[in-house]
């Protein structure tokens, strides 16, 4: 995982390098060939780098490192959405992953906000919110005593998956 972390750090530096966004390179590409232009990552690729970095740190059992990447990802998401909100969709998986890290760190307020944003992002996407994610988010918010947040999601109390239905009928928690 250490090598993966280093490689993603290099990729991020390359992406942030002013040379890759050079006006001279753009002008040369217009006059000659597009292949002269250095590759620039698309917004979803930038966010994917953060997803993998968070997963790398979690795999190493380095919660502090994962939390740093979560905070960096939040800054990157905000920057991307402010730059071009019409072209950039909210990233439900990254929001959900961030919520999990906040939850593991005991930062319940940040976790609740991230869970809420994850559900909203999934709902607004073509993919939709997986029932299992909604189950987990609902139970996490309930555990945090955030019934108002659950109601604000405008979803039924528990998603109708076989596991949730069986557990609900038995009167147990997930």
Q: Could you describe each region identified by the protein language model?
A:
Residues 2-17, 57-58, 64, 68-75, ...:
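TPR/TPR-like (Sel1-like) alpha-helical repeat modules
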Residues 45-55, 59, 90-104, 136, ...:
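"A position-specific structural signal for the A-helix of alpha-solenoid helical repeats
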Residues 35-40, 52-63:
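Second-shell loop/turn segments in exported
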Residues 53, 70, 168-170:
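A mature extracytoplasmic/lumenal domain signature
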Residues 147-174:
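Short loop/turn and low-complexity linker motifs enriched in small/turn-promoting residues
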Residues 24-38, 72-83:
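Repeat-mediated protein-protein interaction surfaces in helical alpha-solenoids
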Residues 15-26, 78-88, 119-149:
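Boundary/linker segments of alpha-helical solenoid repeat arrays
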Residues 41-44, 87:
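Short coil/turn linker motifs that delimit alpha-helical repeat modules in TPR/alpha-solenoid proteins
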